[in-house]
Amino acid sequence: MPPKKQVEEKKVLLGRPGNNLKAGIVGLANVGKSTFFQAITRCPLGNPANYPFATIDPEEARVIVPSPRFDKLCEIYKKTASEVPAHLTVYDIAGLTKGASAGEGLGNAFLSHIRSVDSIYQVVRCFDDAEIIHVEGDVDPVRDLEIINQELRLKDIEFAQKALEGAEKIAKRGGQSLEVKQKKEEMDLITKIIKLLESGQRVANHSWTSKEVEIINSMFLLTAKPCIYLINLSERDYIRKKNKHLLRIKEWVDKYSPGDLIIPFSVSLEERLSHMSPEDAEEELKKLQTISALPKIITTMRQKLDLISFFTCGPDEVREWTIRRGTKAPQAAGVIHNDLMNTFILAQVMKCEDVFEYKDDSAIKAAGKLMQKGKDYVVEDGDIIYFRAGAGKN
């Protein structure tokens, strides 16, 4: 008798399932968050105020994702009527303060805004400027990191303790029911999470089983969100790639947020560039012998969220679509329209690299590079797809 085919366990990702995921800009007050938001979104908010809580309700904007592949496809399908790039939704969340987890400084409202996003850009101030006050009195990025980390952890401990109390109530009923057994397992996991948080660690940086991830996702923990640390330098320090605080920041992140990325950038430089035409901005960067950090900041967050792209190309439109890694063809079709998912028949798939080489759909087909895939096909980053569906919907 042949051995049973092993069913591969589907990996469950931390966070909210879906393709339209959101990144929140987080940090203490007056570290450059709102100016960064204006630069990355090119959305003017007026002059960001030089005092805490200048932003109260989060601002939202969609950021175009830099994509050389999309640009190249638009050149190849240059007669297309419409070009639609991929976007990342970004929120500018008001500055946190020490004591936010206890409700100080409008803390509960701000923490609820963080809870509603899927990932975090944490902006850390590393520049000196006497005209921009620091809520803690002086510039000390490691202290600022510890404040934010502590406030998010304390709130998560509060969430976890409430979840533990709820699980305990059911577990105390006793008996051998499946629900009681599950709640006892949840209690063990939640106790483990609380100990982890009390040690200064973030939930996102720990290794969890798929079963544990499902429970963690139901708790909507703040520290379970992927985080990128944006180190806001002066223009001079960014260009020369030096700052006295960088080593200490790296040591702190390695210890308390291992595996998370640190990206140095300069809000003042990016803000200046945002007011220029693309040509003038390119000329300015050449003159300064540096590059903008924004493309890396945007694309790296998409990677942290496990987001990938597929494309649809034709005479009417070239479009880059965003999906979660591991998405199957019918669900990818559903991103375009629900009817395409419900009546899915097959997907005709080409690879970007083949389109770049052959530059013509008929030549790709003649070369045997056009593949037909069924409902179990897992879409790969860079696929160009023509979906075929029933009921006359293509």
UniProtKB/Swiss-Prot annotation:
- Quote the NCBIfam families the UniProt record gives: redox-regulated ATPase YchF
Note whether ATP-binding occurs among the keywords. Answer: yes
Q: Name one Pfam family in it.
A: MMR_HSR1
List residues of cross-link (Glycyl lysine isopeptide (Lys-Gly) (interchain with G-Cter in ubiquitin)).
Answer: 98
| Coiled-coil stretches | none
Q: Where is the TGS domain?
A: 306-389
Task: Kindly report the protein's main subcellular placement as a broad class.
Answer: cytoplasm
The Gene Ontology biological process annotation of the record reads: positive regulation of cellular response to heat
Identify residues that carry Phosphothreonine.
89
Membrane-spanning parts: none
Phosphoserine PTM positions = 116, 119
**Oligomeric and partner information:** Monomer. Interacts with the 26S proteasome subunit RPT6.
OBG-type G domain location: 21-285
Q: Which residues bind Mg(2+)?
A: 34, 55
The alphabetized UniProt keywords are: ATP-binding, Cytoplasm, Hydrolase, Isopeptide bond, Magnesium, Metal-binding, Nucleotide-binding, Phosphoprotein, Ubl conjugation
* Gene3D superfamilies per UniProt: 3.10.20.30, P-loop containing nucleotide triphosphate hydrolases, TGS-like domain
- Additional comment: Present with 36803 molecules/cell in log phase SD medium.
This molecule's function is given as: Hydrolyzes ATP, and can also hydrolyze GTP with lower efficiency. Has lower affinity for GTP.
Query: Which Gene Ontology cellular-component terms appear in the entry?
Result: cytoplasm; cytoplasmic stress granule
In the record, the note on similarity to other proteins reads: Belongs to the TRAFAC class OBG-HflX-like GTPase superfamily. OBG GTPase family. YchF/OLA1 subfamily.
Keyword match Transferase: no
Name any cofactors this protein relies on.
Mg(2+)
Gene name of this polypeptide:
OLA1
Q: Which domain of life is it from?
A: Eukaryota
Q: What is this protein called?
A: Obg-like ATPase 1
Quick one: which residues bind ATP? 30-35, 233
